[in-house]
Amino acid sequence: MMENWPKKPEGSQWTDDQWKAVVANGRDILVAAAAGSGKTAVLVERIIKKIINEENPVDVDRLLVVTFTNAAAQEMKNRIGEALEKVLIDEPGSQHIRKQLSLLNKASISTIHSFCLQVIRGYYYMLDVDPRFRIANQTENELLKEEVLDDILEEEYGIEDNTIFFELVDRYTSDRSDDDLQRMILALHTESRAHPNPEKWLDKLVEAYDVEGKTIEDLVYASYLLEDVKFQLETAEQHIRKATELAMLPDGPAPRVETLQADLALLGTLSSAARESWTSVYEAMQNVSWQTLKRIKKSDYNEDIVKQVDSLRNKAKDEVKKLQEELFSRKPESFLRDFQDMHPVLEKLVQLVKVFTERFQAMKRDKGMVDFTDLEHFCLQILSEQSENGEMKPSAVALQYRNKFAEVLVDEYQDTNFVQESIIKFVTKDSESEGNLFMVGDVKQSIYRFRLAEPGLFLGKYKRFTQEGLGGGMKIDLAKNFRSRHEVLAGTNFIFKQIMGEEVGEIDYDADAELKLGASYPEGEDVAAELLCIQQTEEEVIDGEEGAEVEKAQLEARLMAQRIKAMVDSGYEVYDRKTDSMRPVQYRDFVILLRSMPWAPQIMEELKLQGIPVYADLATGYFEATEVNIMMNVFRVIDNPMQDIPLAAVLRSPIVGLNDEELATLRAHGKKGSFYEVMSSFLKGAPLEEEKELHDKLEWFYNLLQGWREFARQQSLSDLIWKVYGETGYYDFVGGLPAGKQRQANLRVLYDRARQYEATSFRGLFRFLRFIERILERGDDMGTARALGEQEDVVRIMTIHKSKGLEFPVVFVAGLGRRFNTQDLMKRFLLHKDFGFGSQFIDPRKRIKYTTLSQLAIKRKMKMELIAEEMRVLYVALTRAKEKLILIGTVKDANKEMEKWLDAREHSEWLLPDHIRAGASCYLDWIAPSLYRHRDSEILLELGQGSIPDEIYGYDTSWKVEVVDGNTLLAPEPVQEEKQELLEALREKKAVPLQSERKEEVYDRLMWKYGYEEATSHRAKQSVTEIKRNYQSEEGSDNAFIKKLRAPIQTRPRFMEKKGLTYAERGTAVHAVMQHVDLKKPITEEVIREQIAGMVNKELLTFEQAEEIAIEKVISFFDSDLGKRVLAAKSVEREVPFTMMLAAEEAYQDWQGKSGESILVQGVIDCMIEEEDGITLIDFKTDTIAGKFPGGFDQAKPILEERYKVQLSLYAKALEKSLQHPVKEKCLYFFDGNHVVKIEE
């Protein structure tokens, strides 16, 4: 095949593998692109090569390019556009390239959801959806789900003899609420939607519990758990073998070898049984009997070795004991009874999920909205149809897309899910060996399993495809990294060669997967990767787990602050690729990566204390902000003033300003009843002299509260919020506090959030507050408003997920000692794509519950997937660094942890034993054992090479491994003597003398006045419309006159207002029609209607705007004398933009500045016609006239002439300047009444 592909050009910078990825053709291709390997450049080059191919060029709109984010899609379009423009410079006459540039904007280069949207918009008639549907936001979606689920459960509770439902409720809800049941239904709904056929997946889930006529060996759960049994028995055998080796050492307890050999025989028997069947293992486990260790005189042997032997044997026995208790304490048939008992309950649960899905879809359909999963499923529904055997096959639409797309290219393929894979499959060729699917990704960077991404899709193809592409698809490995120094790459490889394998990690980190150096850097100092392990002594640990976490965050933050400050102050150098030289490091070159953001606030605070600018896009802390908390309490009180805690919080806040004594005084006036009732009662009576101030405060607030409550019933939530801000003065108040801009930004975010909420189909303060409470219950806080831009010279703190795709010269990866988040494994029920549903067996009558086989299998499977995912997350973190990688973790007892980690030194293989890798509870449990097998750890360990092979011990990588004493980090820093004196003076509020040589310069700058003050009060650039308004004084304008003539009409309440377009939107729509109406065709209703429909298709008008166009008024214009002149004109120009310079005094009546100043004026002329005797200017107006003037149009005419005279005069002046011909006539045409007004000077 390779001979038929273009050869790599001489002097090309592409590697052989990159070039292969650019030009390979004729089959499905999977490119495994390692971090920093230039995959985007390869993808763009492949597209360009296809477009400019001389023999078989492909139009860019015949390629489907699927990206992971909208930003990536836009970047891809930009890169393709730039590349095409470069080609055009070399081939300026190429019409083909010019065509591609014009096609680029409508090319299918987008996210999968955007492509789905495109398919649905084109074939909406095949679905039961309104073509004008909108994408629901998360807020609305959550509220709808809650509403639908409440209705369904309420109906179920009302059905008599609903035995199975109440059995389900008894098993999976608490006495207080049915929240757990609701969570189960929603979780099953969400998981099912990640599959191409949700109902089929749900049905399989129920079928798995139908065990009639089956044995335990028939269950998929038992088969999987048997593999786990083998794994644990193998781990136990390794412990015994290690113990035997130690016992046979010269100082070892040799008499115990015989017992250890018996242990090995016992474990061998169990392993043999595990290879046979579940029943065999069960029977073997009932006969387990460990021999008693022979007594020895410990003083005759090395005490440490004896302890190690005994410890290893106990570990082995614990492994077996754990299996006995979890899996083999019950007879096999008892597990089957669990499934039989749970089957009808699970069937009912799935039925509820199906009903929920159906009702939820119906409600969204009624509201004309869809969510992102709907986009995928609707698209799949259009692209597929059912075959005779019930399987999905491509529909006629799918076949059309197959014919259209010459190739489908998928970026970040490792993050694809099952539904997306099906969509891609239906628009590409069936055969992999002759396919047209090009996939790029790195499964080692697949870190979105929580979003239901399925890395197994990538892995399956990677194992199936070959490098030659024989008999199927082709795989290409891009292993060269063009981002990082050798030290970063070698350090990453050294760790991952030891921890990532197929059994534990899902990926074999072999020679093809290793990162290879592709970048060239100048020699650098101090570029070795580092592991800093902080020892947190018992004395330092604050009480409680939460306190310990805070302490760890503080220790790591302080260490990072010290290192950053030292590197900046010392002029540590990094390479600048733009200037091809080394330069001093800046704060923006540093990033601190965290697995999640709970530590970020403490790290930010510590860095700020050290004077280091820092930025983090926090997704938490918003509702904890004092100003937001106070405002939320205000709104809770407006909704229901009987709530004591929110009301007390508001009364105590700066809004009302009661102190503790005043609050107590109020409460003393009524010990019974709510605070609100007591306050109402207090205000009805006459206050005592000493209570008058309290009375005044409360009366002020009470009156405001009544007004707000009334306002909330009639007006919008967002208007209410701004009204509260204004009437309390609280928005201005927080602006004067420290970090005032940030606080005001937070309050604006609350207002914006309310407006977003109101854009949904929900309304009202109560629903809004309930939604916020739901957010807080789920722990989904929002981040505080941004007050610092991302482009500032600051140290950035971000999650590892956020850093994906980014690179930084210096990377700190912190929190490596934090435990993995295994909370999902502890839930009362578990869900898995392959194994379905698993929960405890619960018998509410006997009040017993225990673990089931399905729960154990799913838990084990999920744990192994979690371990694999965490490995990939660590890989992403380490590969963000360009020049310097610093890993930091904190441990409670370094000696104890090191003892555990040093077990790895006893193994001679590159890949650490499965039990070490699978047993990790944090990243340090992988990193430290790996590094402790390298020579650079010997300074710390002083243990020597031992039995570690040379290729591991002497691997070509540089590391600095150090244990840092936490006490040294917490010691206070000394304060310089002069700074101490200054601080003392400030504390005593003494004046501090100004000792600066620039006092005069500072004074001059502060007192300086701008020489063009007048110009600052007027814009240098104006539109014609703004100039027109400037000429209309407030009292003398026609607007004021019209207001006087209008009949007194009261504003219609909002709930009675008709929804529709605004006047401005209607006017824009009419102008658009007048701009695009075809003057060569007959002006009839049918023709105009057809043209309007065409404008909607071209997205020049919306459906709503099209419906509002009064076609008869358009026709009336062309039937008028002026309209006939337009049709008969020599030439007609419409929507003519212009820009001209105008004397400032002409534009501004109040101008008092220098004469000769000019301003830039811009505008758009609706229509100009050229006739034999000159140019006529026409301006279309959609003003409402009928009913506004008692004297009819005769009264309106002089007012309208005056209103638009300046505007048309400027238009005429602009035309005369540009065309060098006089304008003979200026006309206004009013659609309301078919009136023409000629403007005379």
From Swiss-Prot:
Pfam families: PDDEXK_1, UvrD-helicase, UvrD_C
CDD domains in UniProt: SF1_C_UvrD (cd18807)
Transport as UniProt keyword: no
Origin superkingdom: Bacteria
Cellular compartments per GO CC: cytosol; DNA helicase complex
GO molecular function: 3'-5' DNA helicase activity; 3'-5' exonuclease activity; ATP binding; ATP hydrolysis activity; double-stranded DNA binding
Binding site for ATP: 33-40
PROSITE patterns to which the protein is assigned, alphabetical: UVRD_HELICASE_ATP_BIND (PS51198), UVRD_HELICASE_CTER (PS51217)
Domain UvrD-like helicase C-terminal: 505-805
SUBUNIT field: Heterodimer of AddA and AddB/RexB.
Function: The heterodimer acts as both an ATP-dependent DNA helicase and an ATP-dependent, dual-direction single-stranded exonuclease. Recognizes the chi site generating a DNA molecule suitable for the initiation of homologous recombination. The AddA nuclease domain is required for chi fragment generation; this subunit has the helicase and 3' -> 5' nuclease activities.
Name of the protein described by the UniProt record: ATP-dependent helicase/nuclease subunit A
Gene it is expressed from: addA
